[in-house]
Regions:
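Solvent-exposed soluble domains appended to multi-pass membrane proteins
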Residues: 1-327
């Protein structure tokens, strides 16, 4: 969202709202007079989202018990309901910049604990454990929400001029072996189809960028990509005027060297992975690199983490914003 490595002293978002986040997609599009709104189908004040989301560049934040009326009071709430309630509010306000934080796929994953698992359980064809089947059933709600969103965009005749970006929040930690979640075994390995789990496998997922005009094209980036690459990638796709040096990530469609990093200094490139805990570099299949390569990437990772920390500690974005605006 803000292009920085999360701080190790608390929630990055809560700290960042005390400065001008002028590089977010919300703010950049807001300057171009896009209609803007952020939606969430859980409680408005959870994690102070009622305070943080307007700082991301959205004129209004609507959530359950916070302006988003009609959400059924179950846990977790329905993403499909959120889409169907919210789309009519902005679909005629073109161009628009809309942010959704979905919740239907949240834990826990059982028929007793999860309303979305109960709702969609019979839609899932899966022969494994009930826990994983409940997880998959819960995720189906977002699938149906996206089907509804795209259908409404198509009916309005604007699907070809709309970009949808879907990014995961975190791995499904409630599937891990844990007394907290009542799991006697690690269901993550079942879901991922592996026998062993490390952080590089655990955190693997996908970023989806969709537009109706790209339906016939299947562009796939094979190099490592992560959440901090989203902001520079979208900024370039939209032709926005920004300084890429201020962002940690890269444009994934550029020839910039790919790099994915973790706040604890582990990292992954197209050449291999480095585990900071064991201080071990494992080359990717068919790759050979020398120690100088590993040392160079370690230094880059350290600098990016230090930069992110100092931007937050010194409120550098606010200082820069004041300077650019002549304050």
């Amino acid at each position: 969202m803000i292009g920085l490595v999360p701080a190790d002293v608390g929630m990055c978002m809560k700290q960042a709202v005390y400065q001008d986040l002028f590089l977010t997609m919300g703010h950049q599009l807001q300057k171009l007079d896009y209609y803007s709104a952020a939606y969430h189908n859980h409680f408005a004040d959870f994690y102070d989202r009622n305070k943080t989301h307007t700082k991301l560049g959205y004129d209004r934040f609507l959530a359950r018990y916070g302006g988003l009326e009609g959400i059924t009071p179950v846990w977790p709430e329905s993403d499909l309901e959120m889409i169907d309630i919210s789309v009519p509010q902005y679909i005629d306000q073109q161009p628009f910049s809309i942010y959704y934080m979905t919740v239907s796929g949240h834990c826990g994953y059982s028929l007793k604990a999860n309303a979305m698992s109960r709702k969609n359980y019979d839609l899932v064809d899966y022969d494994g454990s009930e826990t994983v089947k409940c997880y998959l059933a819960a995720q189906m709600e977002l699938e149906m929400a996206m089907e509804s969103l795209i259908r409404q965009l198509e009916e309005a005749g604007i699907a070809d001029d709309t970009v949808i970006v879907i990014s995961p929040d975190h791995y499904p930690y409630a599937l891990e072996r844990s007394a907290t979640w009542g799991n006697a075994e690690n269901y993550l390995t079942e879901l991922y189809g592996v026998t062993e789990m490390d952080r590089f496998t655990r955190d693997s997922n996908a970023l989806i960028i969709w537009s109706g005009c790209l339906e016939d094209k299947n562009l796939k980036v094979e190099t490592p990509v992560y959440s901090l690459d989203i902001l520079p990638t979208l900024s370039n796709l939209f032709g926005l005027d920004y300084d890429s040096r201020l962002l940690v990530g890269r444009d994934v469609f550029s020839d910039t060297e790919p790099l994915v990093l973790w706040p604890e200094y582990s990292w992954k490139t197209d050449k291999g992975t480095y585990d900071s805990g064991s201080r071990t570099f494992t080359p990717a299949e068919g790759m050979e690199v020398d120690d100088s390569y590993v040392d160079r990437i370690k230094a880059i990772v350290s600098n990016k983490i230090s930069y992110s920390r100092e931007v937050q500690n010194l409120k550098y974005f606010q200082v820069l914003s004041d300077f650019l605006n002549g304050k």
